[in-house]
């Protein structure tokens, strides 16, 4: 962990992507390397998904499953975001795991990580499946 924090501390400030901004409650990007813990927290919280897609079986009949968006708590959001960051870090070419994770966190802060695409995909599926929430609630009442 100390290697990751040292890399974040010594890295140049991230060039943020306006299409994928960090959350507004954190300090601006040029100040982030001064406090690597906030850097790490800002990257994780910014890429964390708001919902997950749960497949409800037996609602549509015929063996088909119905996607239903379910809101996530803070701990679940952060855990999912960290899993996405680690899976993206595994695909990097650096030799040490700490270097790969640190570079992936920097890529998240700059809006270049594949975790942003995963987040966008999950949110897009959640928006398209939001009408299914009512269907499952009506089924339960019967």
PLM regions with names:
Residues 2-142:
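Strongly charged
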């Amino acid at each position: 962990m100390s290697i990751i924090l040292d890399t974040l501390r010594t890295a140049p400030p991230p060039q943020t992507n306006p299409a994928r901004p960090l959350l507004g409650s954190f300090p601006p990007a040029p100040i982030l390397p001064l406090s690597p813990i906030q850097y790490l927290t800002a990257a994780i919280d910014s890429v964390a998904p708001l919902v997950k897609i749960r497949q409800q079986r037996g609602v549509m009949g015929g063996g088909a499953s119905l996607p239903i968006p379910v809101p996530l708590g803070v701990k679940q959001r952060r855990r999912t975001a960290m899993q996405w960051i680690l899976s993206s870090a595994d695909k990097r070419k650096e030799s040490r795991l700490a270097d790969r994770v640190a570079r992936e966190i920097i890529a998240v802060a700059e809006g270049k990580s594949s975790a942003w695409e995963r987040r966008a995909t999950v949110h897009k599926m959640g928006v398209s499946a939001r009408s299914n929430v009512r269907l499952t609630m009506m089924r339960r009442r019967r």
